[in-house]
């Protein structure tokens, strides 16, 4: 069933508010802060419909709604506008990597650290030998989704054992250059609040994946073009 324009605008408003606050979004909030031009009752009815269609879900602890992975994917594919890196940021990032003139392994580690800083997330990368590079673990500790020690422990433990990266790689199809994954797709309960944006890089004898781990509500409009730029930059700098 295709969504109406009103439903699309409502879904966009709910998701962008959820990305901003990490809290379930109620009809009153949308009515006050979004210029949808409809009554609170209409907003509530449409939220019920979007829930029935699988785009939203209601938490046990709140009357508000949060997006499902289906809702987030629809937002990314159909509603979201990417926010490209500024030219100043692109130049600064490129200069920092080029000026180091490092061997590939050090450059990949350096790239991962800069990506973590740029996205305020946990950045990961692999090389052709399967070695894993990670940076920004402290970043996720500031996010409400990772206040749950069991979730954080699961992510860091699986990363340490390479299980998490193996699970992500297994989800990437051969023709895909960039993929958005949600924790529930990996079938691991403690990863359900997580989101992943990963891309491939390949040049000469070096290939692997590069990406970030964060909450499922991460700001994909910023993260996707950033991860894509880092992959393209890395491919151009591979020695």
Predicted feature residues:
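Short alpha-helical segments that sit at the start of domains
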Residues: 1-12
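N-terminal helix-turn-helix
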Residues: 13-20, 24-78
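Residue-level marker of regulatory loop/turn positions in helix-turn-helix DNA-binding domains and
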Residues: 3, 23, 144
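Conserved RecA-like P-loop NTPase ATPase core
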Residues: 10, 68, 212
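Alpha-helical hairpin
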Residues: 2-3, 38, 67, 85
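Intrinsically disordered, acidic Ser/Thr/Pro-rich low-complexity regulatory segments
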Residues: 73, 80-239
């Amino acid at each position: 069933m295709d969504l109406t324009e009103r439903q699309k605008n409502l879904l966009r408003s709910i998701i962008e508010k959820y990305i901003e606050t990490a809290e379930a979004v109620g009809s009153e909030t949308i009515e006050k802060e979004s210029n949808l031009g409809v009554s609170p009752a209409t907003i509530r009815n449409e939220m019920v419909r979007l829930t029935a269609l699988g785009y939203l879900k209601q938490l046990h602890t709140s009357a508000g709604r949060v997006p499902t992975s289906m809702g987030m994917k629809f937002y990314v594919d159909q509603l979201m506008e990417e926010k490209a890196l500024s030219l100043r940021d692109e130049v600064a990032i490129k200069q920092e990597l080029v000026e180091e003139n490092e061997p590939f392994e050090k450059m990949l580690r350096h790239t991962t650290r800069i990506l973590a800083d740029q996205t305020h997330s946990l950045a990961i990368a692999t090389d052709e030998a399967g070695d894993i590079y990670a940076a920004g673990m402290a970043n996720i500790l500031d996010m409400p989704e990772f206040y749950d020690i069991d979730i954080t422990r699961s992510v860091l433990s699986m990363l340490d054992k390479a299980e998490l990266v193996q699970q992500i790689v297994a989800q990437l199809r051969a023709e895909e250059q960039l993929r958005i994954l949600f924790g529930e797709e990996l079938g691991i309960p403690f990863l359900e609040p997580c989101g992943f944006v990963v891309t491939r890089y390949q040049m000469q004898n070096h290939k692997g994946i590069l990406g970030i781990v964060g909450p499922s509500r991460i700001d994909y409009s910023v993260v996707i073009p950033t991860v894509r730029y880092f992959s393209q930059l890395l491919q151009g700098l591979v020695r």
